[in-house]
């Protein structure tokens, strides 16, 4: 805060949180040879997160929020940040080395819907789409969700967002899809016979 890397109204995670979220780090190498590192979103990521948002095309934002957002304000991010506890609600970011520094190029989140169900959502920068990044994120989020008592994911997806529907279909063979106007509600029960080691995304 003294160096203004985070705002005065941002509170850092408690020390016990910082200890266990270290286990939530992972990496992957894309088919194009790019190394992506994944970790939980932190308050100090605000500027990078906002830069990520403004780097996205309108269609990508619309697919995520179902309406167009022109401004991504400090207050909007604080509202999102206030719900993150790294257990019932969490956001993971993917970072890639760009022009000498790391940039956020993806974010995946889950939020509590009920005691056993968490709603999941993703955004991936256009030049990093179709590289398996959302699939890696959902695998990592499932590991964390299982550790915190969840038994399934849900998602609301626009009917023409075929790429996201493919990600869910590929991972969850027993997923159910319910069409409601322009949206599809997806329910994705976790397979009960899998171990955490089986579903853990690859790490370097």
Predicted stretch roles:
Residues 1-204:
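Long, contiguous binding/interaction regions
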């Amino acid at each position: 805060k003294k160096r203004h890397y985070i705002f005065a109204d941002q509170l850092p995670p408690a020390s016990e949180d910082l200890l266990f979220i270290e286990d939530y780090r992972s990496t992957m190498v894309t088919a194009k040879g790019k190394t992506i590192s994944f970790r939980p979103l932190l308050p100090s990521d605000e500027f990078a997160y906002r830069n990520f948002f403004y780097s996205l095309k309108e269609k990508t934002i619309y697919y995520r929020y179902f309406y167009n957002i022109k401004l991504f304000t400090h207050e909007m991010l604080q509202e999102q940040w206030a719900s993150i506890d790294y257990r019932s609600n969490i956001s993971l970011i993917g970072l890639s080395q760009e022009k000498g520094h790391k940039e956020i190029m993806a974010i995946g989140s889950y939020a509590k819907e009920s005691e056993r169900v968490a709603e999941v959502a993703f955004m991936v920068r256009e030049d990093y789409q179709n590289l398996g990044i959302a699939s890696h994120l959902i695998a990592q989020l499932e590991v964390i969700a299982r550790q915190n008592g969840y038994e399934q994911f849900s998602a609301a997806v626009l009917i023409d967002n075929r790429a996201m529907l493919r990600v869910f279909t590929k991972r969850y063979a027993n997923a159910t899809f319910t069409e409601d106007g322009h949206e599809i509600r997806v329910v994705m029960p976790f397979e009960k016979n899998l171990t955490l080691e089986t579903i853990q995304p690859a790490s370097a």
